[in-house]
Curated annotation (Swiss-Prot):
Residues 622-657 form the UVR domain. The lineage of its organism: Bacteria, Pseudomonadati, Spirochaetota, Spirochaetia, Spirochaetales. This is UvrABC system protein B. Forms a heterotetramer with UvrA during the search for lesions. Interacts with UvrC in an incision complex. Its main location: cytoplasm. It comes from the Bacteria. ATP binds at G38, V39, T40, G41, S42, G43, K44, T45. One of its GO terms (molecular function) is ATP hydrolysis activity. The keyword Nucleotide-binding applies. SUPFAM superfamilies: P-loop containing nucleoside triphosphate hydrolases (SSF52540). The gene is uvrB. Belongs to the UvrB family.
Length: 668
């Protein structure tokens, strides 16, 4: 078994060694629940990485949104370069679920746009879990949604090796059995090609980097190469490779045949139920829809909406559907990041899904079995937990009550202390805020301002810009790339102030920010709860000059609790620094994007070079632009937005050069 190897220039420091030891001891004692209560900037991710390395177990790290999941994914990829670090989030760019609105007698067909790159990562996740133990998966709430049987997926594995006695036809039959399609055109993902004694296949779990080329001689594999999926350049020889089904929804055809009579039986029962209750329209509707699906299953082994028949097709006797948790070995570790937000998400998924599908069943659009294609109920999720570490700066009641140990991680390795908090009356707040911004700008530091509404953030930004402040607003109506560009501008000192709403809470890591201003800090509500205020205060905790100003009319209970907790932590940190003669230092975080190194590696692997690309006549320019677009899509899906911006600009530059070259040829 391959061990987890943690790569880092640093050793655990501050409260990290204590936290690592206490949590590991609790886990080794067999306790199911533990909580890491770590302040912002205390290195909670590094603590998790050390626990995974020391206990040497597969791990699932769950976050509450794609952006933070991608952040964690990148960090764990850096920490564990020699191990399998995977990313499992929803693969829908757009999703309109099948639904029925009785009040309008309106049936809405399912519509979805699937993000190919995220789908690849999901397949790669289950493939890694089927092949090895040294796996870390970073996921979102998608981890509790229905998947296919892990046993069926593992049994789909087929190995190909040099010296294997096998014919081209046998290889082709295996590929088809694993849901791959043959192509006579250019090789694409999920397809294979046959040319003479050479077979090439592009596995579904590969990110477009390479395909496999199998060379045969008289029904024997003599060579296997990895080749670039785009340039077909050889990347290296290998003695063998294992291929899994192209989808994690693996359904053996015998299961389809066994399911058909069961579906027919339940159809008869449900139609009779409708007729007995005088609902002939629903009975006829259900009969027509299900009989059409049955005909498709008989003919092709597949039908539209096949997931609604997963109860029959999976062969499972469980009352719940399979999900990502079932692909893990029994001794895996679960880490719930920002648990105060993530756990309520897990708790709420089932009810919304169930009420929508119940309408479909009650009005004859689906059989009752469709209700079993669903996210897990909360108690089902809890039953699948082996051992868990809740991770949050502000853990909720559930985490505190269930955990055998709640470990504080207050001391930061950098010596940074929680920011000082000043409260000021809201009278004259605009003039006061402008004055504070000027002080920070003079020191070449940055400012975050949080408001309650989008309109307020836009109006305040306009007000500041009119005063000559370099400011931009940040809220959910900006698309992902636009939001990242705004943050990038702040970090690069091209603007000094960001005005936002809820986007300034968990996970926004900008060490240049020394002032966080909270307007309407006393207003009662989600955005000004104790937890939200503490999280917002944490945005100023990565700078040695960190300061938070709360503007208020009347100090609220949430304000008082947030201030008391922050001051408690701050005093502990100051005392520790004085005792150990530590001078706090602002975190230095590189502004440049991580694309440069990755592109250098990709240039070596896939055969293109930005500097030589125009003059290289051996390669198709269109194919090279397609490759860059592929990388751009991958960067966006990985939430590597600064990388995506560089790639986007490079595509524009390259397209422009090609256009100029074409025009010159026309002139000649």
């Amino acid at each position: 078994m391959i061990d987890f190897f943690l790569k880092s220039e640093y050793l655990p420091a501050g409260d990290q060694p204590k936290a690592i030891k206490e949590i590991e001891n609790s886990i080794l004692l067999g306790n199911k629940y533990q909580t890491l209560k770590g302040v912002t900037g205390s290195g909670k991710t590094f603590t998790i990485a050390n626990i995974i390395k020391d206990l040497n177990r597969p791990a699932l790290v769950v976050s509450h949104n794609k952006t933070l999941a991608a952040q964690l994914y990148r960090e764990f990829k850096d920490f564990f370069p020699n191990n399998a670090v995977e990313y499992f989030v929803s693969y829908y760019d757009y999703y309109q679920p099948e639904s029925y609105v009785p009040s309008k007698d309106l049936f809405i067909e399912k519509e979805a746009t699937i993000n190919t790159e995220i789908e690849i990562k999901r397949i790669r996740t289950v493939t890694s879990l089927a092949k090895r133990r040294d796996v870390i998966v970073v996921a979102t709430v998608s981890s509790i949604y229905a998947l296919g049987s892990p046993d069926f997926f593992k049994k789909s594995a087929r190995e190909f090796f040099v010296g294997q006695k096998i014919s081209i036809k046998e290889i082709s039959d295996i590929f088809v059995e694993l849901y791959y399609e043959r192509t006579l055109m250019n090789l694409e993902r999920d397809k294979f090609s046959i040319k003479g004694d050479i077979v090439e296949i592009w596995p579904s779990s590969e990110h477009g980097e390479f395909a496999y080329r199998i060379c045969l001689d008289f029904d024997e594999i003599v060579e296997i190469y990895r080749v670039s999926s785009f340039s077909k350049k050889k990347l290296g020889a290998t003695n063998s490779f294992t291929l899994f089904a192209k989808s994690y929804f693996v359904i053996p055809y015998e299961n389809v045949l066994e399911a058909i009579p069961k579906i027919s039986h339940d159809l008869s029962l449900q139609c009779q139920y409708f007729k007995d209750n005088g609902r002939l329209v629903e009975a006829e509707r259900l009969k027509q829809r299900v009989e059409y699906d049955l005909e498709m299953l008989r003919e092709t082994g597949f039908c539209s909406g096949i997931e609604n028949y997963s109860k029959y097709l999976s062969g499972s006797t469980m009352e719940r559907p399979y999900c990502l948790f079932d692909f893990f070995p029994k001794d895996y570790l679960l880490f719930v990041d920002e648990s105060h937000v993530t756990l309520p998400q897990f708790r709420g998924m089932y009810n919304g899904d169930h009420s929508r599908k119940l309408n479909l069943v009650n009005f004859g659009f689906r059989l009752p079995a469709a209700l079993e294609n669903r996210p897990l109920k909360y108690d089902e999720f809890e039953a699948l937990i082996n051992q868990v570490v809740f991770v949050s700066a502000t853990p909720g009641v559930e985490e505190n009550e269930k955990s055998s140990v709640v470990v504080d991680q207050i001391i930061r390795p950098t010596g940074l202390v929680d920011p000082e908090i000043i409260t000021r009356r809201s009278d004259g707040q605009m003039e006061d805020l402008y004055s504070e911004i000027q002080k920070r700008v003079a020191l070449k530091e940055r400012v975050l301002i949080t408001t309650l509404t989008k309109k307020m953030s836009e109006d305040l930004t306009e007000y500041l810009v009119n005063l000559g402040v370099r400011a931009k607003y940040l809220h959910s109506e900006l698309d992902t790339l636009e939001r990242v560009e705004v943050i990038s501008l702040l970090r690069k000192s091209e603007i000094d102030v960001i005005v936002g709403i809820n986007l300034l809470r968990e996970g926004l890591d900008i060490p240049e920010v020394s002032l966080v201003a909270i307007l309407d800090a006393d207003k009662v509500g989600f955005l000004r709860s104790t937890t939200s205020l503490i999280q917002t205060i944490g945005r100023a905790a990565r700078n040695s000059n960190g300061l938070v100003i709360m503007y208020y009319d009347k100090i609220s209970l949430a304000m008082r609790e947030a201030i008391e907790e922050t001051n408690r932590r701050r005093q502990i940190q100051i005392d520790y620094n004085e005792k150990n003669n530590i001078t706090p230092k602002t975190i230095v975080k590189k502004i440049q994007n991580i694309l440069e190194k990755e592109l250098n590696n990709k240039n070596k692997n896939v055969g293109y070079d930005f500097e030589k690309i125009i003059s290289d006549e051996r390669l198709s320019k269109k194919k090279l632009i397609d490759k860059l677009k592929f990388d751009l899509e991958e960067a966006v899906n990985d939430e590597r937005f600064e990388d995506a911006i560089v790639l986007r600009d490079k595509i524009k530059e390259l397209s422009s050069k090609i256009s100029i070259a074409r025009n010159k040829k026309r002139e000649v």
